[in-house]
């Protein structure tokens, strides 16, 4: 893997956004499990989890503004995102029945596919497959891939 000093500006931006996406999924999980609000979790990530690489092992370098836009966007649009994700699931499944981490991935990635048209759909899908692979080794990444593929083809048919 390239180090930050050897990265091109576009590679650096992609790496920082990838970290922001992973952090946004973690933040949504923390909000749900811990019952915390978006402002508190965003503040906690900014103060205790983000930082220059090497400061401390628990710090991660991420695009903090992108992270905040994802978390705040999901919270703001959750009433639209959840039904959209529900519609992609099999008849007997609902978002609330899924694992909390899968739910967080679907919410953040779904928000990005539906409302962040500045990011190509294929990039969004690939990024959240990587996020899913960071958490799961089983069928979950394939399930998430299929859901996002259906979502993207419905929301952005011109990109396929």
Swiss-Prot record:
Record's keyword annotation contains Transcription: yes
Signal peptide annotation: none
Annotated disulfide bonds: none
Nucleotide-binding keyword on record: no
CC annotations in GO: cytosol
Biological process, per Gene Ontology: DNA-templated transcription termination; transcription antitermination
Domain of life (superkingdom): Bacteria
Any GO MF annotation of the entry: RNA binding
InterPro entries registered for this protein in UniProt: NusB-like_sf, NusB_fam, NusB_RsmB_TIM44
Protein keywords: RNA-binding, Transcription, Transcription antitermination, Transcription regulation
Protein role: Involved in transcription antitermination. Required for transcription of ribosomal RNA (rRNA) genes. Binds specifically to the boxA antiterminator sequence of the ribosomal RNA (rrn) operons.
Family: Belongs to the NusB family.
Entry protein name: Transcription antitermination protein NusB
Taxonomic lineage of the native organism: Bacteria, Pseudomonadati, Pseudomonadota, Alphaproteobacteria, Maricaulales
